[in-house]
A protein has these predicted regions:
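RNA pseudouridine synthases
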Residues: 1-132, 137-140, 161, 184, ...
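Detector for glycine-centered tight turns/loop "hinges" at secondary-structure junctions
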Residues: 113, 197-198
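A late-sequence structural motif
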Residues: 152, 198-201
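Non-heme Fe(II)/2-oxoglutarate
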Residues: 191-197, 208-209
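Conserved histidine-centered catalytic loops in small-molecule metabolism enzymes
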Residues: 203-206
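Pseudouridine synthase
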Residues: 34-38, 109-111, 140-192, 212
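Short, acidic, Ser/Thr-enriched surface-loop or helix-capping motifs
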Residues: 130, 137, 149, 194-195
Length: 217
């Protein structure tokens, strides 16, 4: 693994680039966005670096980006068809009664407020959302959970846990708490088939050694 001045790069070849997106950095290609920062990190201002999936701006962790149009098309297909694996770690306030479970909800989107909400019944714009989780550790008013997404709705993890009374630490959009930390949600593992060779590739990364993550390290 190589650590650059701007962005930590975990793997790179002619087709793909796997890196760790810092919190507060946009996933999209615009000034200050992840592809732009990667070009600076690599010292290649004209490099073809394409976003094929996204993390919320406030979320950090592993992402894979494409290095050419063909790779972007193939990786995007995997994301659409569910062949792309994404696993997250989060720190919740409290501990769910079930240490391992699947959460299923109907989620809608309030575009004016830029917020996601749990809907009571099917309606226009409402989509099914599903995730599985496992409690890895508990400490006082916090629990470390591992999350596997089955759908990729906006703010899905944050809303599904907050609606059950277990908001993430650092959550300011779906909780009234004022935690002294960043949002405790991290893309800890990704897996995909290499767009050229077809080889399955899997990457893991530890969350930052800052509060509240350091309570479990």
């Amino acid at each position: 693994m190589q650590v650059m001045n701007l962005i930590e790069i975990c793997y790179e070849d002619a087709d793909v680039l796997v890196c760790v997106k810092p919190p507060r950095v946009l996933s999209t290609d615009e000034p200050g966005g992840l592809p732009s920062l990667l070009r600076q990190t690599l010292g290649e201002p004209e490099a073809d670096i394409r976003t094929v999936h996204r993390l919320d701006r406030v979320v950090g962790g592993l992402m894979v980006l494409a290095r050419n149009p063909r790779a972007a098309s193939e990786l995007s297909r995997q994301v659409r068809e569910g062949a792309f694996e994404k696993q997250y770690w989060a720190v919740l306030h409290g501990t769910p009664e079930q240490k391992e479970d699947t959460l299923c909800d109907l989620l809608g989107r309030d575009k004016a407020r830029k917020m996601t909400f749990v809907a009571d019944a099917p309606a226009k714009g409402v989509q099914e959302a599903s995730l599985s989780y496992q409690v890895l550790a508990q400490k006082e008013d916090a629990s470390l959970v591992q999350i596997q997404l089955h759908t990729g709705r906006t703010h899905q993890i944050r809303v599904q846990f907050a609606s059950r009374g277990y908001p993430l630490w650092g959550e300011r959009k779906y909780s009234t708490r004022d935690d002294p930390c960043e949002l405790a949600l991290f893309s800890q593992k990704i897996g995909f088939f290499h767009p050229k060779t077809g080889e399955w590739m899997e990457f893991r990364h530890e969350p930052p050694s800052a509060f509240p993550w350091d309570c479990f390290q």
